Design a protein with these regions (language model features):
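Short helix-coil transition sites and intra-membrane helix breaks within transmembrane domains
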Residues: 30-35, 69-72, 83-93, 119-133, ...
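Core transmembrane alpha-helical segments of multi-pass membrane transporters/permeases
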Residues: 37-40, 44, 60-93, 269-331
Length: 452
């Protein structure tokens, strides 16, 4: 259990949270108040409605803002710089054209989904998004199709990789808490991840992409429409994209390789996500900037323009994080878990429901994973279950922690801001995609548990 900062009365907290979320939706959708202001107002309403003392509420809001931005500011900023160079230089255009040539327009989204799945096992969701989303925009611009046709497979791949397949932080975290061997987790997680990508990424993107087209983001800069011969080479662009991913992966696996104590600190430093992105930006500036004929002043203008939307993106993410922390510090997660423990439902289903309810109420996937895994690990008899059954439980927990992303989740606002979608579009596309990932994880977990 995560001890709350303020132990709110359960009934009062549930009412305050429900009214606060309704208030948030009304402020944004009906009264057209900016999401940043609406999020903070709703967070304050929930805290005061739950009876949280004003000094504690102020401290929670400040902590929520700081902890939400911690580690993500540099990722978003550096990712924007990287994406700006990749886009204006024609690098994204080159990759988009190559994917279309190799897979055809109808299968380029599948290629992006597989790319996201692989990348999602090695990096956090936010880092993968900011590195790879320019490729989806490039494909959408080239084919004139809805951006969702390409972005949804990419996002689904990243989400499923993070949730189900080691060495991702999400799958390793819960597997360790339930004492699941990572080899077994990989054997169970890979097919679950592939099925989740199929349903949430490939099939859902075709459905929603034919119905919603948010258009290309307004900050997409004008790309020099050149002949393919004048574009940077596919190999060059691919290598630059892979550099931060390989560095992050090397940092992750170095912890499991004996006899490299001398170089491990170097690998860990270079594999720190923001360091890896700095290296990628510098490589992009030279190979996609200077080598493509851009001078220093032109590169500066490209970088300046690519950073313009990041302030609003970060503020919206912060607002979502503040709501999450207010709910968490009031003890929302500790209300949900014990109630379901006594329900008598199958353990895999209980695991999913605990994680899903915490995810829906608190917003943060990792918090939902941690709290649900802690509750399940403490339940009688869980330690005696078979390794495969426990791996199925990991899939159910992480599926529940992925599903039902909405206005209290910073990821909801990150995706909505990057794609410049309003809240209705984000709910219809992103929230549904995340929920399909989660339900697929549950169904697979239940089926596997029957044979474990």
């Amino acid at each position: 259990m995560i001890e709350p900062v303020f132990a709110a009365d359960p009934t009062r907290l549930l009412i305050a949270a429900a009214v606060g979320i309704i208030l948030l939706l009304l402020l944004i959708i009906k009264f057209k108040i900016h999401p940043v202001l609406s999020l903070v107002i709703s967070a304050l309403f929930i805290g005061l409605g739950a009876g949280m003392p004003v000094p504690t509420l102020v401290s929670t809001v400040e902590k929520g803002a700081g902890d939400t931005l911690q580690g993500i500011v540099l990722l978003i900023g550096l990712g924007s710089l990287f994406g700006g160079i990749l886009e204006v230089s024609g690098g994204a255009q080159c990759v988009a054209q190559t994917l279309i040539n190799k897979f055809g327009e109808s299968k380029a989204g599948i290629a992006l989904g597989i790319t996201g799945l692989v990348v999602g096992t090695t990096v956090f969701f936010e880092a993968g998004v900011v590195i790879l989303i320019p490729l989806a925009f490039g494909l959408a611009k080239k084919t004139k199709k809805s951006t969702l046709y390409y972005v949804i497979p990419l996002l689904a791949g990243l989400a499923t990789g993070f949730a189900f397949i080691p060495p991702s932080a999400g799958s390793v975290l819960v597997a360790n808490m339930l004492h699941v061997d990572l080899g077994i987790m990989i054997a169970v997680g890979v097919p679950v991840g592939i099925l989740s990508l199929l349903f949430a990424g490939i099939l859902w993107s075709k459905f929603i992409g034919s119905r919603i087209n948010p258009g290309l983001p307004s900050n997409i800069q004008e790309v020099r429409e050149e002949e393919e011969a004048n574009l940077p080479s596919f190999a060059t662009v691919l290598c630059i994209i892979l550099v931060p991913l390989i560095l992050i992966l090397c940092s992750t696996i170095s912890a499991y390789i004996p006899g490299i104590d001398a170089v491990r600190p170097v690998l860990e430093f270079l594999g720190t996500p923001f360091v890896a992105l700095i290296i990628a930006v510098l490589l992009a500036m030279y190979f996609l900037g200077t080598r493509q004929g851009y001078d220093g002043e032109q590169l500066k203008k490209i970088l300046d323009r690519s950073l313009r939307p990041t302030g609003q993106i970060l503020l919206v993410i912060t607002g979502g994080g503040i709501i999450r922390w207010v709910l968490q510090d009031c003890g929302m997660g500790n209300i949900i878990g014990p109630a379901l423990e006594k329900s008598g439902l199958p353990l895999v289903l209980v695991a999913f429901l605990i994680a899903a309810l915490i995810r829906a109420s608190v917003g943060a996937a990792v918090v939902a994973m941690t709290m649900a895994a802690g509750i399940m690990a403490a339940m009688p008899g869980v330690a005696e279950l078979s390794p495969v059954y426990l791996a199925a439980m990991v899939c159910a927990i992480n599926g529940g922690a992925t599903a039902f992303s909405h206005v209290n989740d910073s990821g909801f606002w990150l995706v909505g801001s990057l794609l410049e979608m309003d809240e209705k579009m984000t709910l219809k596309s992103w929230t549904m995609m995340e929920t399909i990932v989660g339900i697929t994880g549950l169904v697979c977990g239940v089926v596997i548990s029957l044979f474990a």
